Swiss-Prot record:
Belongs to the chorismate synthase family. This reaction introduces a second double bond into the aromatic ring system. PROSITE patterns: CHORISMATE_SYNTHASE_2. Gene3D superfamilies: Chorismate synthase AroC. NADP(+) binds at residues 41, 47. Pfam families: Chorismate_synt (PF01264). FMN binds at residues 129-131, 247-248, 291, 306-310, 332. Keywords: Amino-acid biosynthesis, Aromatic amino acid biosynthesis, FAD, Flavoprotein, FMN, Lyase, NADP. This is Chorismate synthase. InterPro entries: Chorismate_synth, Chorismate_synth_AroC_sf, Chorismate_synthase_CS. Pathway: Metabolic intermediate biosynthesis; chorismate biosynthesis; chorismate from D-erythrose 4-phosphate and phosphoenolpyruvate: step 7/7.
């Protein structure tokens, strides 16, 4: 089975659940590997009150024994501590005194289209699953992918380079992505970080919210992940789809795509050069991807996130129970979630790269995958990377 995952759970239900399939046997995997990324997702200047309640910790339900994967699906659970405050409203069992339905859909959310699609009379049935709380499960799956990629020296980082009108050079942000965890807004430039925080404070004071842009960088990918032979296997398309599936992400860019559209071809292509005894590139304007495949340079994927749709200053809507104009229902939300989205972006990029890696080198046992990888790297004249390389 191909590497991938499925999630289940509602925002204020008992737990978020994820099943990761296609995980090879023999991979070292500990709860702390997952908890580290779960904690990073919860950080970030501008987060809402929910993060003061939750203390996300993973529980393995299957697929791992004594710290090693078994080759069977890895099942994980992250409990929602806030469920204790929502048990009557979100109990899976019938209740004698159900809560009043919510009929004031919020612009920018899945509320109205979701109610129309599924025939619901209560938008709670939509917003609970469409909530970004589901990304807890994605980050857990991404942590498994990160551990697998790490065995072969592939590392995935992210950095925020824009929040609202405050921005830094994206190339500099990508180069400093390994240091982004030091910043409350995941921006590697300390001076820009402070201006971003001030921008978030101003939006919060105005009872509003901010979006922004982040970049994910994957270093150490061997050439040849993905394929040009079938459109479904093209890696840039798969990466773009995975990243834009994150809540509130409205645009994705591979390398310098939009800048390249304004330049001549001779100014855009990454020329092939010798690096010692191996082949490399003189630049990385195409973001490490050519013809739907990795080319050995760092994979660079940027994303644009719109502002969180739920704001204190409720927007106009129509009450579906009366047909009258009204103000939208307000659910607790963040002022800015771009730093958290960057961590989720890492997870989605890691999942896609892990899937492509196992397609190329096999998927049953880690030992066999390593042998296949090392043989391939010898054949193309590049050194094989190891864990922590």
């Amino acid at each position: 089975m191909r590497f991938g995952f499925s999630t289940a759970g509602e925002s204020h239900g008992p737990a978020e659940v994820v099943i990761v399939h296609g995980v090879p046997a023999g991979l070292r995997l500990l709860a702390e590997d997952v908890d580290r990324d779960l904690a990073r997702r919860q950080l970030g200047y501008g987060r809402g009150g929910r993060q003061k309640i939750e203390r996300d910790r993973v529980e393995f339900l299957g697929g791992v024994r004594h710290g090693r994967t078994l080759g069977s699906p890895v099942a994980m659970l992250v409990r929602n501590r806030d469920y204790a405050n929502w048990e009557r409203r979100m109990n899976p069992a019938p209740v004698e005194d159900p809560p009043e339905p919510i009929t004031l859909p919020r612009p920018g959310h899945a509320d109205l289209a979701g109610m129309q699609k599924y025939g619901f009379g209560d938008l709670r049935n939509v917003l609970e699953r469409s909530s970004a709380r589901e990304t807890v499960a994605r980050v857990a799956a991404g942590a498994v992918a990160r551990r697998l990629l790490g065995e072969f020296g592939v590392r995935v980082f992210s950095a925020v380079y824009r929040i609202g009108e405050v921005a830094m050079d994206r190339a500099l942000a990508a180069a400093g992505a390994g240091k982004a965890d030091r910043s409350e807004v995941r921006c590697p430039d300390p001076e820009v970080s402070e201006r971003m925080k001030a921008e978030i404070d101003a939006a919060r004071h105005a009872r509003d919210a901010l979006g922004g842009e982040f970049v994910v960088v994957a270093e150490g990918c061997p050439p040849g992940l993905g394929s040009y032979a079938d459109w479904r296997d093209r890696l840039d398309a798969r990466l773009a789809a995975a990243v834009v599936s994150i809540n509130a992400i409205k645009g994705v860019e591979i390398g310098d795509a939009f800048e390249a559209a304004r330049r001549r071809s001779s100014e855009v292509q990454d020329e092939i050069v010798r690096r010692g005894g191996a082949l490399g590139r003189a630049s990385n304007r195409l973001g490490g991807l050519e013809g739907g495949m990795t080319n050995g340079e760092p994979v660079v994927v940027a994303a644009a996130m719109k502002p969180i749709s739920t704001i204190a200053r409720a927007l106009r809507t129509v009450d579906l129970s009366t047909g009258e104009e009204a103000r939208a229902f307000r659910e607790r939300a963040d002022s800015c979630a771009v730093p958290a989205a960057a961590v989720i972006g890492e997870a989605m990029v890691a999942v896609v790269l892990a899937e492509a890696f196992l397609e190329k080198f096999g998927a049953d046992a880690l030992e066999d995958i390593r042998a296949s990888y090392e043989h391939y790297m010898r054949r193309i004249g590049l050194p094989a990377r190891r864990a922590d390389a």
